[in-house]
Amino acid sequence: ADHVPDEAAAMINCAIATAAGALRLAGDLSQGRVLVLGAGALGLAVAAQAHAAGAAHIAVVDPSPSRCERALPFGAACARTAVDPEQRYEVAIDCSGAPAAMRAGLRALEVGGTAVWVGAVLPQPPVPVDAEQVVRRLLTIRGLHNYDTGDLVRAVQFTEAHHRTYPFAELVQARFPLADLDAAFAHALATGPWRVGVALREPD
């Protein structure tokens, strides 16, 4: 939609749509407790959509304190550098791809809880799973790679409705014209921003 800033709209077909798919697999989050592992753009999108879906409590975990702080405007009730061993959640969504985080998410689930793994998109060491605990605690593990058409539609609708509530546009920390694509890549490598925008055309 025209009223959505380019910077926010640019997040739709990656982080926001993938997050919509993760929430689809997670099921009804209303009044639930949700753990989000990883506070990159995907983790922030998951937190924001869980918040908009009515989750009662959203905890975001990331080893980076600055990323934890960034999660708070996206609906996180708390953000920590490690999982609190005293807390339990109905849903744990891993956006990090780190085996240790996925294991921590399983340990943090309530009986009957659901783990959704989204971040493991590259080859990595296997994740040891305690089958007895999965069986006794009635756990569900679901994986998602990319998103479907319905997820993309929901991502567009979410962004139209909530782009002023959750500051996705602020994640695009630099903007370059298409003619300066090499400079955009160089800037991204040198500074490590959340996102770098490349404008296919500049506003009239």
Question: What is each model feature region?
Answer:
Residues D2-T81:
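Mid-domain Rossmann-like dinucleotide-binding core that forms the NAD(H)/NADP(H) cofactor-binding site
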Residues T149-D204:
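C-terminal hydrophobic helical "lid"/dimerization subdomain
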Residues P99-A161, R201-D204:
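Glycine-rich phosphate-binding loop and adjacent beta-alpha segment
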Residues G97, E110, L189, P193:
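Short conserved AdoMet
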Residues D84-A92:
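A short acidic, Gly/Pro-enriched loop at the edge of an enzyme's catalytic core
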Residues A39, V60-V61, I93-D94, V118-A120, ...:
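Glycine- and other small-residue-rich loops at beta-strand/loop junctions that grip anionic moieties
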Residues A9, I16-A19, G43, Y89, ...:
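A general structural signal for well-ordered alpha-helical segments in protein cores
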